């Protein structure tokens, strides 16, 4: 990348630290983001570096001592040039400032994850999809996601990303699945096809699971208790795998996969979002997975398994869509 960074993952980790923790806004932000960059989140879409800078400053006000610790960068070369990264971050911060997401300052400590899917060309990020675990944030501040969304709807500041808001950016690729990306994307597709039996067949019996709302869990039952209710809440929604990266040969790392996916349809079933309302809902999700050799009790010898799984979606954005429909 440059003399300052060893490679593309190092660049992604480094500019994140420079922008957020070193307060590298202004000129540094313009060096790292294209003037017309598009950033999509479950809460909406932002266009251009000035919007990125404004959103960054607003979060800095809410959580001024935030540390962003990069857990992994799963990446690939992009078709036609450039590179694409799926960057998983765990943040720790103190809520000492007020803001739209967090409300009046509470002094509470928060820990949460985000995954940013970024396309970079010519040393600048020009296309991005970002999912932050807002459900974990508001819960740690003493508010349930449904209550937060209800207040946002009542105040007239409820926003959510829907497909009709999207616009094409400079990146039109679908990733580089490889063996491990294809495997994980296939598993998610089968789960969303109600084939829940793939969990005990393909997840390790002692799998480590990190789910929305800051949930940490282990084992097949925990995976089933996350995926089944999510699908049940939107039983007829169209599931799409939007982007896949697989990596199997990075030194000192297990095989990994990053999958960005979406559910588009109506809230027609029971699940984590209460009684069915018929509300139109779009869910943007990003998952990371690590694979390993340990097979639990239901695998044929020699097979692989999902040992760790990270899933991110924004519960507050889903509730906004449901409650906005209810009026």
Language model features with spans:
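C-terminal and inter-domain tail/linker signature
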Residues: 1-327
